[in-house]
């Protein structure tokens, strides 16, 4: 049994969990998330707690226990992330470093000048909110942890930090190890 799944996921007030045909729906004050799961584990709601237990029917061979334990911990974390997402939400902050590098919102698109000959245009997905409080700062927020991280990674990939100069888009707090330049 996974060490994580030995403990239940405690549901805060205002959060409900529905389980139907291996699909878990979590509703909360910020919205609703749903996720489909494989039948290796049983997900049960008891009061204000969610338990993730092994599904004994799926274990045919002794070697199946390893797979069941693996999915048990993974699904426990995914459900916990869904509960936190619908109550608090997730946020990733990016900073743009470089002279002339900046970002701005234009309707439903993020337009960035990143030193290329043309501005980089990124279409903002509907399930994620992007704010630009300053020209060199981007805040990506939403209720789905995986989606927020994916969008932040896509934006960072347009101009990752240069290892020699440090210019580019980086996460706030990310330390970029810089290499030494050429010796003259």
Curated annotation (Swiss-Prot):
GO MF terms held by the record: rRNA binding; structural constituent of ribosome
Gene3D superfamilies linked: Ribosomal protein L6, alpha-beta domain
Key words, A-Z: Ribonucleoprotein, Ribosomal protein, RNA-binding, rRNA-binding
Cysteine pairings via disulfide bonds: none
InterPro entries linked to this entry: Ribosomal_uL6-like, Ribosomal_uL6-like_a/b-dom_sf, Ribosomal_uL6_a/b-dom, Ribosomal_uL6_bac-type
GO CC terms: cytosolic large ribosomal subunit
GO BP annotations listed: cytoplasmic translation
Assembly and interaction partners: Part of the 50S ribosomal subunit.
Family in the record: Belongs to the universal ribosomal protein uL6 family.
Described function: This protein binds to the 23S rRNA, and is important in its secondary structure. It is located near the subunit interface in the base of the L7/L12 stalk, and near the tRNA binding site of the peptidyltransferase center.
Entry protein name: Large ribosomal subunit protein uL6
Lineage: Bacteria, Thermotogati, Thermotogota, Thermotogae, Thermotogales
Gene of this entry: rplF
